[in-house]
UniProtKB/Swiss-Prot annotation:
Lineage of origin: Bacteria, Pseudomonadati, Pseudomonadota, Alphaproteobacteria, Rhodobacterales
Family listed: Belongs to the UPF0434 family.
Naturally occurring in which organism (per UniProt): Roseobacter denitrificans (strain ATCC 33942 / OCh 114)
Coiled-coil parts of chain: none
Superkingdom as given in the UniProt entry: Bacteria
Protein name, as recorded: UPF0434 protein RD1_0037
InterPro entries reported for this sequence: Trm112-like
GO cellular component term, pick one: cytosol
């Protein structure tokens, strides 16, 4: 991680839910994604900000 990279604040997990399933999310620090196991989607985190758009989410294998 570079010095200028913004880190995701894990406290945000308490307030965020998956926009598709309305379930809680898990944080994948290595991939910088929020995972919705119910919806089978991974939402990217860019510059420390979760992108909670279904169209931007990656479908999990």
């Amino acid at each position: 991680m570079s010095e200028t990279e913004v880190v995701f604040d894990r406290r945000m997990l308490e307030a965020l839910i998956c926009p598709r399933s309305h379930e809680t999310l898990k944080y994948d620090q290595e991939r910088q994604e929020l995972i919705s196991e119910t919806a089978n989607l991974a939402y990217p985190i860019r510059n420390g900000i979760p992108v909670m758009l279904i169209d931007e989410a990656r479908v999990l294998d």
